Regions:
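Non-catalytic positions within long, well-ordered alpha-helices that form the structural scaffold/packing
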Residues: 77, 179, 260-261
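Short, flexible loop segments at boundaries between secondary-structure elements
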Residues: 228, 288-309
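Short, solvent-exposed amphipathic alpha-helical segments in soluble enzyme
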Residues: 23-24, 147-148, 179-181, 281-285, ...
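A short, acidic, amphipathic alpha-helical segment used as a generic capping/interface helix at domain edges
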Residues: 248-264
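FabD-like malonyl-/acyl-CoA
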Residues: 2-140, 189, 266-296
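Alpha/beta catalytic cores of group-transfer enzymes, especially the acyltransferase/condensing modules
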Residues: 11-13, 101-247
Length: 310
């Protein structure tokens, strides 16, 4: 018996035109976009489907990504394809929790809009930075970072790809230290803040307050949290984990390894791009990964797994 995981990408995967074919194809998907436009007072179709300058601004990106990923998921689930477990990278974790049954679509969209605003406004522009470290051993990176204050690891994405985060000068110092240690590729990222660093703790605190009056539901299936790379089956843990997540390392590689060890053998990446599929090729080449970012992709996945659909 196959075990299926739905996995969701994070900020940075967004692109103009994402989800446009789903809106035209599925009334369920269209309803999610229209509902998001209504509750946020944003033209979500213009934001997601047309070239614009807002899509790459954190306060808009996060709501656009979650709306799109949940609209795509609605098409799969309407056809009867459901996951046994979910996970999402950073922002994608909100999709994972919503699909696992922990929060309704409207609340997920509303909450990530606030999250985006908090994250964008917590640290003044230019004070924080992030950099991708390519092709280096994790132990070497951790050793190089240890003596440097105000820099830490944001993402353990996969073997050979680590993202560091923190104060701009500290990240730049870390990059120079890594290069001196023989690391060939360090790329400064074009981001609006030092995400997943302790500098984001105030954003986590604001997010925690925002969740005070939210209605949570018991999880129908588990999700794997970025913070610990462990299964979450109790919704009461979720608020604290989400508040902590914005200032904590994303343990994506360990999350995928945890799922594989638990018998997950099919991963469906839902959302724009193929970032997570690329990570998985370096984590475990034997894992079967399908990407769904067009209606054609969705139809192929539904057809392939028709025998799993009850």
């Amino acid at each position: 018996m196959n075990k299926i995981a739905f996995i969701y990408p994070g900020q940075g995967a967004q692109k103009a035109g994402m989800g446009k074919d789903f809106y035209a194809y599925s009334p369920l998907a269209a309803e999610i976009y229209d509902k998001a436009s209504e509750i946020l007072n944003i033209d979500m179709k213009a934001l997601c489907f047309e070239e614009n300058d807002l899509l790459d601004q954190t306060e808009y990106t996060q709501a656009a990504m979650v709306t799109t990923c949940l609209a795509m998921t609605a098409v799969l689930e309407d056809a009867g394809l459901h996951p046994d477990v979910t996970a999402g990278l950073s922002l994608g974790e909100y999709c994972a929790i919503a699909v696992a049954g922990g929060m309704i679509t409207e609340d997920a969209i509303r909450l990530v809009r606030k999250r985006g605003i908090f994250m964008q406004n917590t640290v003044p522009k230019g004070e924080g930075a992030m950099a991708a470290v390519i092709g280096a051993e994790t132990e070497l990176i951790e050793k190089c970072l240890a003596p440097i204050e105000d820099v830490s690891i944001a993402n353990y994405n996969c073997p050979g790809q680590i993202v560091i985060t923190g104060k701009k000068l500290a990240v730049e110092q870390a990059v120079e230290t890594l290069k001196a240690a023989g690391v060939r590729r360090c790329v400064m990222l074009n981001v609006s803040g030092p995400f997943h660093s302790p500098m984001m703790i105030p954003a986590g605190e604001a997010l925690d307050q925002e969740m005070t009056d939210m209605q949570w539901s018991e999880l129908k299936i588990p999700y794997v949290t970025n913070v610990t790379a462990e299964y979450v089956t109790d919704i009461h843990e979720t608020r604290a984990l989400l508040a902590k997540q914005v200032a904590s390392s994303v343990r994506w590689q360990a999350s995928m390894e945890r799922m594989i060890a638990d018998g997950v053998d099919i991963f469906v990446e839902i959302g724009p791009g193929k970032t997570l599929a690329g990570f998985m090729r370096k984590i475990n080449r034997n894992a079967k990964v399908y990407t769904v970012n067009t209606v054609d992709d969705a139809q192929k996945v539904i057809e392939e797994f028709r025998q799993l659909i009850i």
